[in-house]
């Protein structure tokens, strides 16, 4: 029977994939199986290359730019990483878990009571906050992409999947810690009843399928500079959603966002420590790498966000985050200033080449230039738009939110 079924399925898939899906549902799952209405149409993509490509054009993809000399410098840090990097990880047994913040499922009556309390706390929170919180959660849920991309860094890869190099151990454990963030926010949002879960889930699938344009070039110098910046950005974002949740009266949600922010801060400390060490042993190469990443402009990891409807979903989500003060253009310049101070870029002297000194000069004046550009852009927006534009978000059942 199995052989006959496999043979029949093979022929059917070649002739008509949609028929094969229907045949499998009837034969393998029973004739009484009735999938949800939106799944009754063929689930086989008619044009996979178009369906699963990023919503925005990704160009100028460059790979493996690190020189052998720089690679050897990075590899020389392995003992240092073993002694200094892994200490930023927390033991699993003493780590918080999502269930610590969610309704208890063991007691049915208590569960329903706690869900009602959760819904009562969240029912008056404005839609714009939920748009930003959902966007933050979706960003966290794209964790498979981040681990995949980090595992492309030359000299820092987990070559076997169970490698015991400090870089591999860190990457797996960092991923495990980060995994709790999306899990917790996703469950809380689901229980709140305030969001259209299916459209949120579609966005997550689209985002993971689209990938991420980091411009790392497989270079660990670039990779750890990027993660230093991004962990700082996510720390700021989650800390601000925590403050707003307190303002709106949901102390549990505030604690959730604050706990996630604390994780991001610890991870920021780890990644900035790696780059600090790179500055110590190779200041010229590291300052040039930092300048290169800033010239390419470090972008948020969810830039390719899409829900199947809004081609500019990330920009709209980011605009709402800017308006309510969760993550702003001013924060971008502030993060750069913070990192330049942290790595003492202005104090670099001996050991810099001519190109290194030019990179240093560029970086030290960049925050001020970014702020000036932001001010001009804000002025143009204010002059051009007397009315307040709004956009419909599928995440909140198509309701409109001001940008």
From Swiss-Prot:
* Oxidoreductase keyword on record: yes
Q: Which residues bind Fe cation 1?
A: 140, 178, 181, 264
In a knockout, what does one observe? No visible phenotype.
Look at the named UniProt entry and state the broad enzyme category this protein falls under: oxidoreductase
Tissue specificity here reads: Preferentially expressed in roots.
The family database entries (InterPro entries) matched by this protein are listed as: Fatty_acid_desaturase-2, Ferritin-like_SF, RNR-like
Q: How does it assemble?
A: Homodimer.
Report what the protein is called.
Answer: Stearoyl-[acyl-carrier-protein] 9-desaturase 4, chloroplastic
